[in-house]
Each structure stands twice: as structure tokens, then as C-alpha cells.
Amino acid sequence: MFVSMEEQVILVDEKDNPIGLMGKMEAHEKAILHRAFSVFIFNEKGELLLQQRAASKYHSPLLWTNTCCSHQRDGETNIGAGRRRLQEEMGFDTEVKELFSFIYKAPFDNGLTEHELDHVLIGYYNNAPKINKEEVESYKWMTLIDVKNDIKKNPKEYTEWFK
């Protein structure tokens, strides 16, 4: 997938104060700290909805990860951004709440680096998603124990931010 140069990320300091905007690719090329979010959706059985990233993703293609993740738009709340991407990637909307945030930095083989202040959002949904094949290759529901064990056994099949 081609990432438009117009797509902007919100640059932040380590306390999540906005300090500017930058093109998404440039921020990843220069490893500049920027705001992001990760959504974790559970069903009534306590299983986590995982997605396999589409083959066309510019980094981490075909790797398994949390339900969805992306970057907030300028002026968009964390909750609003999470619900927007749930709809765009997984084809459903549900209430989410923010649990915590953390900073991580992960370089990739393609010269890009994720350096994000990541807001973690949680929600609940019990139906099958209607995945957007441009964003998501596949999905599965797994218990947290099974996720933990599979990451230990197959770490290269999961995204850095999910491990």
C-alpha cells in the first residue's frame, strides 16, 4: 500500500504534549516520537481478537498483532481514533476505553523505525469482524494464555509492539 505524503502524525514529547506534525513516512524514517494507539477487543469468552496485517503493509506485513492500531489525526481523540480504525480495518464499531500508554522504539529491516507513544484501548465485541482486505489479511480469536504461548514459540510471526 502506498502511504500518502499528506498523511500526518502528531509529534509528541515524552509526556504526550503535541510539538508538531510530520508526514507519516518521514517520522518513521527519522524515528521521531509520535502519538499512536493500539486497540484490544475481547469477546464474552475472554478471547482477544487478533489481526494478521495485510501483505501490502509498508512494515510488518503478514504479522499477527492486536485488533487494530494506527495514528491519531490532528484534533482527534484517542477514543475517536480507535473507533474510526476499528470500523475501517475490522468493519465494526464498539465502545472502547483507554487503559494506559507507553513508549517504545523498534527498528525494522526496511530502514523504518517505530518510535511511538502508544495509547492502549480496550473494548468488547462478540460477532465476527468484516475485515477490510486492504488492511487485514485474516483474523482469529485467541485466549491470552494461547497468545502468550504462541508468541514464545513463534516470536517472528508477531509485531514488535504486540510482543
Predicted features and spans:
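A structural signal for short, well-ordered beta-strand segments
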Residues: 39, 68, 98, 119-121
